[in-house]
Amino acid sequence: MIDFLKGRLVSVYPEAVVVEVGGIGYRVQVPPSLAASLPEPGETVFLYTYLSVKETALEMFGFSSELDRTAFLLLLGVAGIGPRTALAVVGRLGTRRLWAAILREDTGILTTVPGIGVKSARRIMVELRDRLEKQQVAVSAELPASDGVPVLAGRAENEALAALISLGYTPREAREALNRLPDRKLDAAGLVHAALRIMGSQ
């Protein structure tokens, strides 16, 4: 898998860009909001990527952050959601608003995305809420507080920290959100839900 591209921006279209890396031009599908925020052609850009492999075509999708790519990949796991629809959701809502909508079970905000009807919105809610609860990482959550944010002490808190990191948040962002919770006696899933609500409201 091509994890990211760093190269010269050649062309910008409403929903795609061309990036030159090592003399090769890569056409990358991106949300319109990202395309509009990129610098002028000729400047260097950095995009996290996902390569979709089909029998008839290869398509690359680009994101400004690992957090957005994580949300895109989770959406791809929902039945009936393809890469272009997943990209539209991430581009229209943004990852933090998406997580907050899922936790509030707000299907209305999802149906504002072209191509997402009520049934698809409900399916996303059910499947992603379950995945958010079960998301795990294969790294230790007990990371040093080198950024000045206190390390969390409880087991549930560290499990929640690991889950938030696996969703694409930085250790600092995750610890800050968990440290802001008024109720720290929840289980790991409860802590994750509460922290996502805080970050989704920012």
Swiss-Prot record:
<comment type="similarity">
    <text>Belongs to the RuvA family.</text>
</comment>
<keyword id="KW-0234">DNA repair</keyword>
<dbReference type="Pfam" id="PF07499">
    <property type="entry name" value="RuvA_C"/>
</dbReference>
<keyword id="KW-0963">Cytoplasm</keyword>
<dbReference type="InterPro" id="IPR012340">
    <property type="entry name" value="NA-bd_OB-fold"/>
</dbReference>
<dbReference type="Pfam" id="PF14520">
    <property type="entry name" value="HHH_5"/>
</dbReference>
<dbReference type="GO" id="GO:0009379">
    <property type="term" value="C:Holliday junction helicase complex"/>
</dbReference>
<dbReference type="InterPro" id="IPR013849">
    <property type="entry name" value="DNA_helicase_Holl-junc_RuvA_I"/>
</dbReference>
<keyword id="KW-0233">DNA recombination</keyword>
<dbReference type="Pfam" id="PF01330">
    <property type="entry name" value="RuvA_N"/>
</dbReference>
<dbReference type="GO" id="GO:0006310">
    <property type="term" value="P:DNA recombination"/>
</dbReference>
<dbReference type="InterPro" id="IPR010994">
    <property type="entry name" value="RuvA_2-like"/>
</dbReference>
<feature type="region of interest" description="Domain I">
    <location>
        <begin position="1"/>
        <end position="64"/>
    </location>
</feature>
<comment type="function">
    <text>The RuvA-RuvB-RuvC complex processes Holliday junction (HJ) DNA during genetic recombination and DNA repair, while the RuvA-RuvB complex plays an important role in the rescue of blocked DNA replication forks via replication fork reversal (RFR). RuvA specifically binds to HJ cruciform DNA, conferring on it an open structure. The RuvB hexamer acts as an ATP-dependent pump, pulling dsDNA into and through the RuvAB complex. HJ branch migration allows RuvC to scan DNA until it finds its consensus sequence, where it cleaves and resolves the cruciform DNA.</text>
</comment>
<dbReference type="GO" id="GO:0005524">
    <property type="term" value="F:ATP binding"/>
</dbReference>
<dbReference type="InterPro" id="IPR011114">
    <property type="entry name" value="RuvA_C"/>
</dbReference>
<dbReference type="GO" id="GO:0005737">
    <property type="term" value="C:cytoplasm"/>
</dbReference>
<dbReference type="InterPro" id="IPR000085">
    <property type="entry name" value="RuvA"/>
</dbReference>
<dbReference type="InterPro" id="IPR003583">
    <property type="entry name" value="Hlx-hairpin-Hlx_DNA-bd_motif"/>
</dbReference>
<comment type="subunit">
    <text>Homotetramer. Forms an RuvA(8)-RuvB(12)-Holliday junction (HJ) complex. HJ DNA is sandwiched between 2 RuvA tetramers; dsDNA enters through RuvA and exits via RuvB. An RuvB hexamer assembles on each DNA strand where it exits the tetramer. Each RuvB hexamer is contacted by two RuvA subunits (via domain III) on 2 adjacent RuvB subunits; this complex drives branch migration. In the full resolvosome a probable DNA-RuvA(4)-RuvB(12)-RuvC(2) complex forms which resolves the HJ.</text>
</comment>
<feature type="region of interest" description="Domain III">
    <location>
        <begin position="152"/>
        <end position="202"/>
    </location>
</feature>
<feature type="region of interest" description="Flexible linker">
    <location>
        <begin position="144"/>
        <end position="152"/>
    </location>
</feature>
<protein>
    <recommendedName>
        <fullName>Holliday junction branch migration complex subunit RuvA</fullName>
    </recommendedName>
</protein>
<dbReference type="GO" id="GO:0009378">
    <property type="term" value="F:four-way junction helicase activity"/>
</dbReference>
<dbReference type="GO" id="GO:0048476">
    <property type="term" value="C:Holliday junction resolvase complex"/>
</dbReference>
<keyword id="KW-0227">DNA damage</keyword>
<dbReference type="GO" id="GO:0006281">
    <property type="term" value="P:DNA repair"/>
</dbReference>
<dbReference type="GO" id="GO:0000400">
    <property type="term" value="F:four-way junction DNA binding"/>
</dbReference>
<keyword id="KW-0238">DNA-binding</keyword>
<dbReference type="InterPro" id="IPR036267">
    <property type="entry name" value="RuvA_C_sf"/>
</dbReference>
<feature type="region of interest" description="Domain II">
    <location>
        <begin position="65"/>
        <end position="143"/>
    </location>
</feature>
